[in-house]
Structures are given as structure tokens and as C-alpha cells.
A protein has these predicted regions:
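HIT superfamily nucleotide-processing domains
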Residues: 1-189
């Protein structure tokens, strides 16, 4: 469902700016509330490896976990809640929260996997650009702050602007499993 915010003249009975038009279209995605509200989080949270999806994913079949590629220190996995089609995460196998806690091998392979992810996404999806980044800590926007992960978000001309990343809302044209298969096939051995 989409719609623009509309100003409603209530004769001065409103308190504040509620209802003022901002000119932006809205795409309502109620399914995102599962992620936002934490309904699918394990009871103990993500702080311990036993409940961390990034610790569990490498032990599952690739088709189930959406893992695209595995290295010695890190792996690439599709984001279950993508900001844009093809949104990949590069994660160390080790359950570590802070970038400064990575060792040299993890840091180097994370960089190489990020570069490879960009090449694969360009080849498969013809991305025009990328947003790369890590949210370090819950206050910085990390949904799973206990396990470091690098975002590789493909961008296309006309895909709006950075708002789909911040607004966490985007229509996806392809099933995640289909995207995973295409990326895994294109990932160099």
C-alpha cells in the first residue's frame, strides 16, 4: 500500500505538525514489524553464539541459510531483511562485535569478500553503485550488534535515494533463494 502524507485542516484543533504534507510517498510494509519488534529474536537475544543467526548460518545448508560463499575467516550471506535486492552481509565466523577486535586474517578476508561481493552483484544485477558499511553497536543501528557484519547494499540510478536504506523499506523483485543461487554461481572459486 502506498500513499502520500496529506494535510488535514481540522480548524486549528491539532497539536503540532501531525498530518503536515512532506511530499514523500509511503510504502507500508507490515511484515517488517517482525524484525523491528524483535518477534523472531531468540529468547536470550543475539549476544551469545547459541542464539546468533550469524553463528548458526554457516552450519546450515547454503540454500536454507542463504550463504553465498565461504572463506577461511568470513562468509557472505544474503540479508534476510534486505534494504535493496541483492543486499549481502560479510560476516566473520568468530562471534565478535567490534571491528577493532578482528585479527589481521579476518580483516583482510572481510575486505576481499566485500570487493568480491561488489563484483558479483555488478555481474549478476548490473548495480550502478553501492552503500558499504558497518553499524557498530545498537545505538548506531545494528540489529545484531553482538556479531560484526559488513553491509554491501547495491544501488541503481532511480532507486529513490538513501531513504530505502534508512527507511528499511523496499519492494524486492526476486525471491532471496533465487538471488542466492545466482550469486553463488557467479562467486569465483
Amino acid at each position: 500500500v502506498t500513499g502520500a502524507a496529506r494535510h488535514v485542516d481540522d480548524g486549528g484543533n491539532s497539536s503540532g505538525d501531525a498530518g503536515l504534507a512532506d511530499g514523500l510517498e509511503r510504502l507500508w510494509t507490515p511484515h517488517r514489524m517482525t524484525y523491528i519488534s524483535g518477534e523472531d529474536r531468540p529468547e536470550g537475544g543475539y549476544d551469545k553464539p547459541a542464539g546468533c543467526p550469524f553463528c548458526l548460518a554457516p552450519g546450515l545448508p547454503a540454500e536454507q541459510s542463504l550463504v553465498v560463499a565461504r572463506g577461511r575467516h568470513v562468509f557472505a550471506v544474503l540479508n534476510l531483511y534486505p534494504y535493496n535486492p541483492g543486499h549481502l552481509l560479510v560476516c566473520p565466523y568468530r562471534h565478535v562485535a567490534d571491528y577493532t577486535d578482528l585479527d589481521a586474517g579476518e580483516t583482510g578476508e572481510l575486505a576481499v569478500f566485500t570487493q568480491t561481493a561488489m563484483r558479483v552483484i555488478r555481474k549478476v544485477s548490473n548495480a550502478h553503485g553501492f552503500n558499504l558499511g558497518m553499524n557498530q553497536g545498537g545505538v548506531a543501528g545494528a540489529g545484531i550488534a553482538a556479531h560484526l557484519h559488513q553491509h554491501v547494499v547495491p544501488r541503481w540510478g532511480g532507486d529513490a535515494n538513501f531513504m530505502p536504506v534508512i527507511g528499511r523499506t523496499k519492494v524486492l523483485p526476486q525471491l532471496l533463494t533465487d538471488t542466492r543461487d545466482l550469486f553463488a554461481e557467479a562467486w569465483p572459486a
